[in-house]
């Protein structure tokens, strides 16, 4: 019986090149752990999601009670639902940290990898939004109505597009069925795109905290970074299990424990916490189309990051002005997240508008200008 050789077997060769003998920069920090954590989160979400789909019924008359049935009657159904719902929150925390690290250390200059990453972000956001609709509680129904209705701001075709998505003249059974179908399908598309993301990353190799060429100082991925990633996975699982077992409903909206009722509108319609920053930007503009464009811009701004890079240095490690201006929009996003959860009244309206203007000004104007100033200082 022949032995399997890592470098000869066609399947093992791919694994060997991407997980075992992958040349990695020796100085990458814990900020580089979030990629593997996102992979773990995706596997967890797909696994728990498949088991939940076995018991869920995508019908407006039975969807809410089927979720109650999962949590009460199915063996460990409460755990599956808790892991899936809170796993989404952990997924987005890792995702935002991963993007933040990419911006701070200039990883966006690897354009192909960066653009596939943004596509992954959009797909993940769409998947999470559709998943929020499935329990068919009050916030699910009204969230679906309000967010899909934003497309009606598109000139000429907006209304027809909304009705086409709804499958009728309002959010109804057809909407729930198609959202369930797409929510089940998109994670597999995300998995495929993740593979492309990794292939494009390994084409040039990982960036590192200094932003310099790390070719003279590479070490194999295994055992150094494989064990480092395992530590990250363990810490993440401890956090997720603590949240799921002790505070399973901490991040869910109380309104969603009430079955969907088209005749009763909740006092304050809002999405899940990880979309609140974009929702706050949307609400801060009085015009509907303007709000939708600002909402889209808050995320699509990531596409022009390589264009906005005016510095001679790739990373922000040795750039003090850029560091201050990096943490300013980070704090600004926290403020926007808080504002998105507040009712539409003063002083929240004013704070939201100020924070929205500040967000775009920092990214589009102040950070590129600071980089130009730092370039000038390097000449002295």
Curated annotation (Swiss-Prot):
The chain crosses the membrane at residues 34-54, 78-99, 114-134, 179-199, 227-247, 289-309, 321-341, 348-368. It is found in: Mitochondrion inner membrane. Heme 1 (or BL or b562) is low-potential and absorbs at about 562 nm, and heme 2 (or BH or b566) is high-potential and absorbs at about 566 nm. Keywords: Electron transport, Heme, Iron, Membrane, Metal-binding, Mitochondrion, Mitochondrion inner membrane, Respiratory chain, Transmembrane, Transmembrane helix, Transport, Ubiquinone. GO terms for cellular component: mitochondrial inner membrane; respiratory chain complex III. GO terms for biological process: mitochondrial electron transport, ubiquinol to cytochrome c. Binds 2 heme b groups non-covalently. It is a multi-pass membrane protein. The gene is MT-CYB. Component of the ubiquinol-cytochrome c reductase complex (complex III or cytochrome b-c1 complex) that is part of the mitochondrial respiratory chain. The b-c1 complex mediates electron transfer from ubiquinol to cytochrome c. Contributes to the generation of a proton gradient across the mitochondrial membrane that is then used for ATP synthesis. Its cofactor is heme b. Heme b b566 binds at residues 98, 197. Belongs to the cytochrome b family. A ubiquinone binds at residue 202. GO terms for molecular function: metal ion binding; ubiquinol-cytochrome-c reductase activity. InterPro entries: Cyt_b/b6_C (IPR005798), Cyt_b/b6_C_sf (IPR036150), Cyt_b/b6_N (IPR005797), Cytb/b6-like_sf (IPR027387), Cytochrome_b (IPR030689), Cytochrome_b_C_euk/bac (IPR048260), Cytochrome_b_N_euk/bac (IPR048259), Di-haem_cyt_TM (IPR016174). This is Cytochrome b. Heme b b562 binds at residues 84, 183. Its main location: mitochondrion. The cytochrome bc1 complex contains 3 respiratory subunits (MT-CYB, CYC1 and UQCRFS1), 2 core proteins (UQCRC1 and UQCRC2) and probably 6 low-molecular weight proteins.
């Amino acid at each position: 019986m022949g032995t399997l050789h890592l470098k000869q077997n066609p399947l093992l060769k791919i694994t060997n090149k991407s997980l075992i003998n992958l040349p990695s920069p020796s100085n990458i920090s814990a900020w580089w752990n979030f990629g593997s954590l996102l992979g773990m989160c995706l596997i967890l979400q797909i696994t728990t999601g498949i088991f939940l789909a076995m018991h869920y019924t995508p019908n407006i008359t039975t969807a809410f009670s089927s979720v109650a049935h999962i949590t009460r009657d199915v063996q460990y159904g409460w755990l599956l639902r808790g892991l899936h719902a809170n796993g989404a929150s952990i997924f987005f925390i890792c995702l935002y940290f991963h993007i933040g690290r990419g911006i701070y250390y200039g990883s966006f200059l690897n354009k192909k990898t960066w653009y596939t990453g943004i596509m992954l972000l959009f797909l993940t956001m769409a998947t999470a939004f559709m998943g929020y609709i499935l329990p068919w509680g009050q916030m699910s129904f009204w969230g679906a109505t309000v967010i899909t209705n934003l497309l009606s701001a598109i000139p000429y075709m907006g209304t027809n597009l909304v009705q086409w998505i709804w499958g009728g003249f309002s959010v109804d059974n057809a909407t729930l069925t198609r959202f369930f179908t797409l929510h089940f399908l998109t994670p597999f598309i995300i998995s495929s795109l993740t593979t492309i993301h990794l292939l494009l990353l390994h084409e040039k190799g990982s960036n590192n905290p200094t932003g310099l060429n790390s070719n003279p100082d590479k070490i194999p991925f295994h055992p150094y970074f494989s064990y480092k990633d395992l530590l990250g996975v363990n810490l993440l699982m401890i956090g997720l299990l603590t949240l799921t077992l002790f505070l399973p409903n901490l991040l869910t909206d109380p309104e969603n424990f009430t079955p969907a009722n088209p005749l009763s509108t909740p006092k304050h319609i809002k999405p899940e916490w990880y979309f609140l920053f974009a929702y706050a930007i949307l609400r801060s503009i009085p015009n509907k189309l303007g709000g939708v464009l600002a909402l889209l811009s808050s995320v699509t701004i990531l596409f022009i990051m390589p264009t906005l890079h005016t510095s001679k240095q790739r990373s922000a490690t040795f750039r003090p002005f850029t560091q201050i201006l990096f943490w300013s929009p980070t704090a600004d996003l926290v403020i926007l997240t808080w504002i998105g959860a507040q009712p539409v009244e003063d002083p929240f309206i004013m704070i939201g508008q100020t924070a929205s203007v500040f967000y775009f000004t920092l990214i589009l104007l102040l950070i590129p200008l600071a980089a130009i100033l730092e370039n000038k200082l390097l000449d002295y």
